[in-house]
Amino acid sequence: MHLTVREEERIQLWSAAEMARRRLERGVKLNYPEAIALICDEILERAREGSIPMLTDMMEYGATILKKHDVMEGVQQMMKIVQVEAMFPDGTKLVTVMNPIRD
């Protein structure tokens, strides 16, 4: 099977996000890379399925995925911005989420 670099990156992101989901289910707090992976994967999946078609709505959704109690101490302060290119029904857009982990 031959994958493009973008496809390989997407698989790696999904894998990290799945690990993060499993850890959250067990009550384990997420570290920085796990939190980034989970937020990005959720945004990419919602954009792909078209359930959140507006960019501004997706930016708001990105800030609801994780809360402060879901991540290790200090992760919320380190994560000021998350950006990911997502494929929407009308094309690729850069989704920017400011302060993605809220109280």
Question: Which residues does each PLM region occupy?
Answer:
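Non-transmembrane, aqueous-exposed alpha-helical and coiled segments at domain scale
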Residues: 1-83, 87-103
